[in-house]
Amino acid sequence: MSKQPLKYLLLWLLPLLLSANFVNWLGNYDVAHQKALKEHKLLLVLVVKKNNSLSSQIIKNSFMDQDYVDGINSKMVPVIVTYEGALSYPIEMYYTTIFPTLFFVDSSKETFLREPLYGERITKEEIQKLLQ
């Protein structure tokens, strides 16, 4: 079997992958909080539950290849935390029973800037409105 078709396929896919617009999620709350403080940015906290199809769907549909992704990356420090990893983030501050939940936080005061978005309310339209 020739490697030539695979080579051309990879060359064709590379620009698509490089042009994909996605949120630069961090996976550690403490690191994200320190970065947000240092850069004077807001903290965007997405709490997900492992093996939750709605969480995966929302990440794919609302946080990939959207016009507002650059705005999120420039104005905020986004972090994903898992409910099951409760020791890795202040669960008492981000307590929720609905997954996923999206919190908008003033990093210096550790206060919520608005009501969180829960589950299916995390839509492209809602996120776009918040960034205007």
Regions found by a protein language model. Name each.
Residues 12-20:
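Hydrophobic h-region of N-terminal signal peptides that target proteins for export
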Residues 1-10:
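Bacterial N-terminal signal peptides that target proteins for export
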Residues 23-27, 48-49, 68-87:
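Thiol-based oxidoreductase modules, predominantly thioredoxin-like and allied folds used
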Residues 40-53:
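Short active-site neighborhood of thiol/selenol oxidoreductases, capturing the structured segment around
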Residues 55-71:
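Typically the conserved alpha-helix immediately C-terminal to a functionally engaged Cys/Sec
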Residues 98-132:
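Non-catalytic, surface beta->alpha helical segment in thiol-disulfide oxidoreductase systems
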Residues 21-39, 131-132:
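N-terminal leader/targeting and pre-domain segments
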Residues 50-53, 62, 83-87, 97-98, ...:
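Solvent-exposed loop/turn segments at secondary-structure junctions
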